[in-house]
Amino acid sequence: MQGNRDGSWSLRASAYGGSGNGNGGYLPQTTPVFHNYIVKQQQPIRYNFQTQQNLNFPHPQFGGGANVELIRIDKAVNNTRKSLIAAGDNVSSTRVSQSVLAQLQADTWRSLGIWMQDVPSLRQLMALEGKIIAFIHCFIGARGIVTLHDLEVAICQNEFVGCFDDLGLGPLLQHPLVLLYFPSVYCSTAPVKITSEEIISLLDSYLNTYDIDDVKLDEFLDFVAEAKAVTSKEKLGVRIQNLRMYVSFIQDAKRQEGEILKIVLTELHQKYRILSSKKQRQDKDYCGKHTRFNSPSSEENDSADYEVENVKRSDHFSSCPYSSAEEEVKQLGSSSKKRKAESRNHEKSDSPKLLRRGPSKLRRGHVKQKIPKSADDSDAQIFSVNDADFTLSEGALKLFISTWKETCKELSISVFVKKLLSFYNLGGSEVHGQIKIATAVSSFPFVGLLHVAKELVTEALEEQIPTEITITNLVAGYNDCTGTRSRANMPNPTKSCSTPVTLAHNSVSTDFSIRNQLHTGALWAAQAQESGKKGEEIAYRYFVAKYGKKALVKWVNEHSETGLPYDLIIENRGGNKEYVEVKATVSTGKDYFNLSVKEWEFANEKGESYVIAHVLLGNSNAILTQQRNLVKLRQDGHLRLLILMPSQRNEVNVAF
């Protein structure tokens, strides 16, 4: 080969050392870069190369025959690649090349007179394979926690494909580098969908659950496998390097968070102390200058009988918003005397002034004051009413409960009171009268009575009017005098142990076709489900607080009903498990609950490991009772079985 006359080399070159004007090389600049300076041009160094070709090296012929041969080889490469993908094997350039050479009955590509890069399909496969190999090495090397799911998602995003199979390299789990970095997933069919973020979150949960600093990798992976419902940790497809570093980072982050919260709480406490000290000083100033106070706005709607009295008292003001105890007693006493005088003057009158309130109003939540009683009016009454005015027949009470029980269930207390007053025409057409009634009902003691009544009616909803239970029908041959505590056993002044009496408004009857029954059906399924969910939540929080870091408490029905014969699983560090079934109620007198056949069989199977947690729900707290090993408790007589007759049954009247 020979260079050009000016010492440069031609850019043209034969692909495989063929003859030509040059062998390909670098063309130096012949013009100076800086035009303001004169640079002395030096003569290029000439190199004389052998122009004689190696006759033993076969050179490809790029004529028509060569193109046909390349097309045939390219087609063989594509067919081989498709067959490997269909078989579920990994696709690599080496494997495809060897298979194509075997099909063409050639030992090497040199014997065919071409290179591997000359085949378009093979060249594209080599480029893609090298890119994927480099990406996997860098991705795994740069991350301490890597999952197969993360790796597949990253490769697909980098190559703009939907899944790894679209690359035409076979399954991801069959890739040689995947088997190198994740050797335990060789028998898996698909990677588990778990991200590195989930691994870190589970590591945080693991540290909170067991409260340990020295985390063992195998134990933590077992914890992750159980959380993801995977049969073994080997199938997770998770690679973790330097686990201790992540544990340290999480602990440092929690420590910093605690310090920040401590600073914020300290600032809030200081601010609260400042506000409290200011309020105490204001209260001290108010109490030191206490005078009698009458609110004019609260009596704007009263009748004209008190206008003169309000004018006389208008000169009394106070810096304290509440009356003193002596003034309140004085006002209540004068109001009582005024009403008694009106009662004596209008005994035969139907005027509503009999029950009209004076200027001293009831305040919600006011402190109870003891009112002294004089000797001359010790037996007097504020209201001129008889005991007969407060009597209510059993039928009327039953009608009232059946009328308003749905309203109590659906409406709030304020809307319920409004509907109640409107239904019995107690609201009145006058605005002043409506405001008076609303104010009275929303104040003590009436507001307390309303809430008590609403709670009782709501309780009757869940129990399906528990007063319909007949004592003699609870258990055959069961004496009520020695029975366990139940709603039927609650104190009742109208019954005795010797005579069976139906509770409340149900009368005793010898007609067995209309006898009272214990209702346990799902008439109020929505409310029962809500109570059950609340009871499970309370029991879950109780056991979590009780065991702390000593055991792991799992709520199986937290997101949806599983149908299992238990609601909670308590697993200690030794691997022992306890199964807790929660039974919840809002009734203080309900000491029974339903138990399915599956639950009873499971209780018999687990024995001491099966616990019934009975939760009595209250307004602000709950009472939890545990019963362990139901079968043994039944054998020892501590529990009783209750058999209910079906609602549809064949009955025969027998005369005697």
From Swiss-Prot:
Top-rank taxon, per record:
Eukaryota
* Annotated spans, Disordered: 283-375
In this chain, composition skew of type Acidic residues spans 299-308
Bias type Basic and acidic residues, positions: 342-353
InterPro entries (UniProt xref):
Auxin_embryo_med (IPR052957), NOV_C (IPR024975)
Locate the compositionally biased regions of type Basic residues. Answer: 354-371
Q: What is this protein called?
A: Protein NO VEIN-LIKE
Point out the gene that encodes the protein: NVL
